[in-house]
């Protein structure tokens, strides 16, 4: 407080450049160039010439929503005279400003004394409590007054363009609003305004309906064109006039009212001054005290809620009624708390708030389209079935409102019911398109049938088909069980080599050998199935070979099997090789059998080879043999059989002499190879040199050379 009195609270005022820049930003460049004193004199003369009846008629007949009309001009003239008289040094310090009896009583009170001008308002809504918190004003409520005592000073000031007094502030050494330097009586010393500079105040923009509401300040706000410094200078001029009055004059009944608080402008200082607490019947705080401590927060929240108006054009009428009742309750609650006059006294502002910010974005035709789309959703011949909970909820609300209306007195309100257009609903059965023999299909969906996208075709099947499919499923499951059982036996047999290497004693070795024989016998029995002797169950073996895991298992089992049983396995494989090749198109697992088949073929005799070659070539037609030879495993197996035959014939053993059956089978295979094109022949897994040498035994020179050139160019090994 001492720093404000001494003038040390505004160190920035010492910098002239900042002040000039601030004045230019506030008033505009060249605002003080014109003769503002001459304008004051001219406006004062105009005011004296106006008759009192004319002023009264203009004040009473002006509309409420005319914020910048004739009333503001009258207020401007009165303020001009105030400023002019305040600046005349000939007036005594304690003199009162007298006016003619013809002036409007709504502007000048009955005691013919000018009352302190109330502070201006900014355009934003601020409650008195927020101003007290922000500027540190005193919290003493002003005395109430009648509505007839509200003068033109409570009205909004004109814009800068129409008021040279406000737009062009006087250039003087001491700013307007500086307290007078003359002495005062002891009773008045406690209420001196200590702020040496113009003030910058924000206040509430509305007054309440009751005349004794402390939160009511002004009816209309300042125009938005006025800068904060201009408003502060106006307040400073009024403060000087009020300070020149004696304490006895403030005690008169016509002069009581809130007075200006001392607040330093935020634009020119870093802190806010405080006001001396009022004593006795001296100065009152300029801004009133709110009716409750939480009035500021509550009013702000209510304003924010009222500004947000949801678009309820598409809602149920019950929804609209509920929202309207809530709005009425808020307005009543706001009127009880002293803030309800804001909307009733400002119809222009209320109309502005009600204006839809999104108006004009849609054409009327587009709005009708949206309404029709929304009504389509409400069309229902059975609302309780389509929207059961919605209907019951609003039935309960209607019953509750009816019961409340019965308890009240007055006319009964008619219930609003939603009326939707009646649309004839045609009952029809949905029949999707049927495709015979298909598992599922996509059908055309619609709004009435959105879920029926897939309709499974129910095809009638005979008992024979079902029995056959069941047998196939059971057979495949049985084959998988057999493969797992044989694999477990195979793993045990392969593990015996490790166990033999770890065995040291002979007795233990014999035990392991016996156990190995048992495991091998179990494996052979599984391959034979129900067959007797050294024969393999052909159907079971083919099912095993149709599964990729079974093929790899057979390739590992063949070296462990006895020779006769292994030869039987090769014979069945050669006999069904064309079928196995077709089943192996995706797996491509047959080539893994080539190495183990070669080990078994090296132990077979010529009659066994003849039987195997006959199963491969003789039992099939020429076309089937061509298909086998175009497969990599089939061509490799043929080369391996011919290579073993060449070895037996080259050994000179009389038991291994060529037989007529063997010769015819070799010639048949050679002619088939000559008919297959070079591009169709695959690359075998073994060398064809030995096979070509064996072919030369039974072919002439020409065919032998052709076959040699074809196989050599195809395989690239010659």
Curated annotation (Swiss-Prot):
It is found in: Cytoplasm, P-body; Nucleus; Nucleus, PML body; Nucleus speckle. InterPro entries: Pat1-like, PAT1_dom. Disulfide bonds: none annotated. Residues 9-23 have a biased composition (Acidic residues). One of its GO terms (cellular component) is PML body. Keywords: Cytoplasm, Nucleus, Phosphoprotein, RNA-binding. Residues 1-30, 139-188, 327-347 are annotated as: Disordered. GO terms for biological process: deadenylation-dependent decapping of nuclear-transcribed mRNA; negative regulation of cytoplasmic mRNA processing body assembly; negative regulation of translation; P-body assembly. Residues 144-157 have a biased composition (Basic and acidic residues). One of its GO terms (molecular function) is poly(G) binding. The modification Phosphoserine is found at residue 62. Belongs to the PAT1 family. RNA-binding protein involved in deadenylation-dependent decapping of mRNAs, leading to the degradation of mRNAs. Acts as a scaffold protein that connects deadenylation and decapping machinery. Required for cytoplasmic mRNA processing body (P-body) assembly. When tethered to a reporter mRNA, able to repress translation. Interacts with ribonucleoprotein complex components. This is Protein PAT1 homolog 1. It comes from Xenopus laevis.
């Amino acid at each position: 407080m001492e720093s404000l009195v001494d003038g040390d609270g505004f160190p920035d005022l010492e910098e002239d450049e900042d002040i000039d820049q601030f004045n230019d930003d506030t008033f505009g460049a060249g605002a003080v160039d014109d003769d503002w004193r001459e304008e004051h004199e001219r406006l004062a003369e105009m005011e004296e010439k106006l008759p009192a009846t004319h002023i009264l008629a203009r004040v009473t007949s002006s509309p409420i929503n005319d914020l910048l009309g004739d009333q503001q001009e009258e207020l401007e003239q009165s303020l001009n005279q105030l400023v002019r008289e305040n600046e005349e040094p000939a007036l005594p310090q304690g003199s009162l400003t007298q006016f003619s009896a013809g002036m409007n009583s709504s502007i000048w009170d009955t005691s013919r004394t000018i009352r302190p001008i109330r502070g201006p308002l900014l355009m934003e809504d601020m409650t008195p409590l927020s101003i007290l918190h922000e500027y540190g004003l005193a919290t003493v409520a002003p005395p109430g007054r009648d509505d007839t005592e509200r003068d033109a000073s409570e009205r909004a000031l004109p814009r800068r363009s129409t008021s040279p007094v406000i737009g062009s502030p006087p250039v003087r050494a001491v700013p307007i609003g500086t307290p007078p330097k003359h002495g005062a009586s002891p009773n008045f010393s406690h209420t001196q305004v200590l702020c040496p500079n113009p003030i910058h105040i924000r206040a509430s923009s509305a007054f309440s309906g009751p005349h004794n509401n402390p939160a009511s300040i002004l009816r209309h706000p300042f125009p938005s064109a006025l800068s904060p410094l201009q408003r502060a200078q106006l307040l400073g001029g009024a403060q000087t006039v009020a300070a020149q009055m004696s304490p006895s004059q403030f005690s008169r009944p016509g002069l009581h009212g809130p007075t200006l608080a001392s607040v330093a402008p935020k634009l020119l200082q870093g802190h806010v001054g405080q006001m001396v607490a009022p004593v006795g019947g001296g100065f009152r705080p300029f801004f009133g005290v709110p009716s409750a401590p939480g009035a500021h927060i509550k009013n702000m929240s209510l304003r924010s809620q009222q500004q947000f108006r949801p678009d309820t054009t598409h809602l149920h009428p019950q929804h609209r009624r509920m929202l309207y009742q809530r709005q009425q309750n808020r307005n009543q609650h706001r009127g009880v708390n002293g803030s309800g006059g804001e909307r009733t006294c400002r119809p222009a502002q209320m109309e502005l708030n009600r204006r839809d910010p999104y108006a004009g974005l849609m054409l009327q035709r587009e709005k009708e389209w949206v309404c029709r789309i929304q009504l389509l959703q409400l069309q229902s011949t059975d609302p309780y079935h389509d929207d059961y909970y919605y209907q019951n909820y609003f039935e309960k609300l209607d019953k509750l409102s009816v019961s409340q209306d019965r308890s009240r007195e007055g006319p009964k309100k008619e219930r609003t019911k939603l009326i939707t257009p009646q649309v004839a609903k045609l009952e029809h059965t949905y029949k999707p398109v049927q495709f015979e023999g298909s598992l599922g299909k996509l059908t055309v969906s619609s709004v009435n049938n959105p879920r029926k996208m897939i309709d499974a075709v129910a095809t009638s099947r005979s008992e024979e088909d079902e029995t056959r499919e069941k047998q196939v499923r059971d057979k495949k499951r049985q084959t998988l069980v057999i493969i797992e059982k044989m694999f477990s036996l195979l793993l045990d047999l392969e593990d015996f080599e490790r166990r033999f290497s770890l065995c040291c004693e002979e007795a233990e070795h014999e035990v392991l050998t016996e156990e190995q024989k048992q495991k091998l016998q179990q494996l052979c029995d599984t391959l034979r199935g129900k067959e007797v002797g050294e024969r393999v169950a052909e159907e079971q073996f083919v099912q095993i070979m149709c599964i990729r895991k079974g093929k790899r298992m057979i390739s590992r089992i063949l070296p462990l099997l006895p020779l006769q049983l292994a030869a039987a396995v090769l014979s069945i494989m050669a006999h069904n090789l064309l079928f196995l090749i077709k089943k192996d198109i995706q797996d491509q697992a047959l080539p893994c059998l080539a190495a183990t088949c070669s080990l078994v073929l090296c132990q077979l005799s010529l009659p066994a080879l003849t039987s195997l070659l006959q199963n491969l070539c003789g039992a099939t037609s020429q076309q089937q043999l061509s298909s086998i030879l175009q497969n990599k495993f089939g061509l490799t197996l043929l080369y391996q059989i011919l290579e073993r035959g060449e070895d037996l014939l080259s050994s000179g053993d009389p038991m291994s002499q060529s037989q007529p059956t063997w010769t015819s089978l070799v010639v048949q295979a050679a002619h088939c190879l000559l008919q297959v094109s070079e591009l169709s022949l695959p690359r075998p897994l073994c060398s064809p040199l030995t096979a070509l040498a064996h072919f030369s035994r039974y072919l002439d020179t020409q065919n032998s050379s052709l076959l040699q050139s074809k196989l050599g160019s195809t395989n690239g090994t010659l």
